[in-house]
């Protein structure tokens, strides 16, 4: 199924997962709002970044990224600098505090090896206080990628025949399939899930389909979909990466 002619020449939003199928796509050529996930900042600067793990969020802040952020579903709560001494116990990973930082967030997540848990104190750079929002409890426990798709439709479209592209959403293998596999704050390729990674991916697919069904006036284009079981939804289409820039 391919995208309809009536969708030509309209605004586009690109939601980038971190599956290997997007590794050969030149992100700088994407004409529209680019929403990235987690460690994408290591390779390019998206317009918006979405993250749900504390370790990745601390890395994003320490990288100097100063764009719009959606961090956690409901746990990003600013605390005044006066609360630091009563809370800190010296075991946390604490980000660099600039001289003008007035607020921080105290949050727990996984350590860099994605095995142990770790608490983080994230100092918020001056000017970023209003650029970082919670994703929202309506998609609590969703994956980062599917949460980013939800954000794209809720906050970055007019719900009027705009195109929403999905890139790097690779949900077909039964192993951890990610560009950043075996790096800090990411699982190893041989990591396991109780019911297998495919079961996890199937759940993520259901989240994607829910978003698509909730926005019938938007056209969704899944780039580099792999498999012969393409979902039959009236507003979901497929394209190869070579066709992204074709009318």
Please place each PLM-identified region on the residue numbering.
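Metal-ion/cofactor- or nucleotide/acyl-coenzyme-handling active-site neighborhoods
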Residues: 1-247
